[in-house]
Amino acid sequence: MADNARAKRLADLIREVVAQKLQRGIKDPRLGSHVTITDTRVTGDLREATVFYTVYGDDEERKAATAGLESAKGILRSEVGKAAGVKFTPTLTFVMDALPDTARNIEDLLDKARQSDEKVREASAGATYAGEADPYRKPDEDETDTEGAVEADETDDTAK
């Protein structure tokens, strides 16, 4: 079992090698400049590596890029083996990264929240308070109220 630092270094190396080969070494038109390697994770035994990628474009370009990565998997693995210098070259698995879609969804939700906040702000622009503007007692009011309460208590005792 390898230590975490070694697995992290190997994952970083795999990410760099795969990204460089996609830019310069692979001549597949499906793997144009719209494929980005976002992250790489290596198992503890350094035998398997998961490469996360994003594709800028529509669903057809995503499917084409996925097929292109699967066809170039052997070439990419051999390049990783040359660069890594480990006893066993990790098996590469390509997984489309869901982070951009999740971020886009969160941005849409935040936009909806901003719009609803703006509607509430517009609706409350001409509104007035149901009671007084400041419903809380002030310290000088508390003193006068407590004196009246003490006098009322004294009168209640004498009435009995």
UniProtKB/Swiss-Prot annotation:
Which Gene Ontology CC terms are recorded?
cytosol
Q: What is its main location?
A: cytoplasm
UniProt keywords (A-Z) are: Cytoplasm, Ribosome biogenesis
Q: Which InterPro entries match?
A: KH_dom-like_a/b (IPR015946), RbfA (IPR000238), RbfA_dom_sf (IPR023799), Ribosome-bd_factorA_CS (IPR020053)
Q: Where is the composition biased (Acidic residues)?
A: 141-160
Region feature Disordered, mapped onto this chain = 112-160
Protein name listed in UniProt: Ribosome-binding factor A
Q: Name a biological process GO annotation.
A: maturation of SSU-rRNA
Regions of biased composition (Basic and acidic residues) lie at 112-122
Q: Which organism is it from?
A: Streptomyces coelicolor (strain ATCC BAA-471 / A3(2) / M145)
Q: Which HAMAP family match?
A: RbfA
Describe its function.
Answer: One of several proteins that assist in the late maturation steps of the functional core of the 30S ribosomal subunit. Associates with free 30S ribosomal subunits (but not with 30S subunits that are part of 70S ribosomes or polysomes). Required for efficient processing of 16S rRNA. May interact with the 5'-terminal helix region of 16S rRNA.
- Family affiliation: Belongs to the RbfA family.
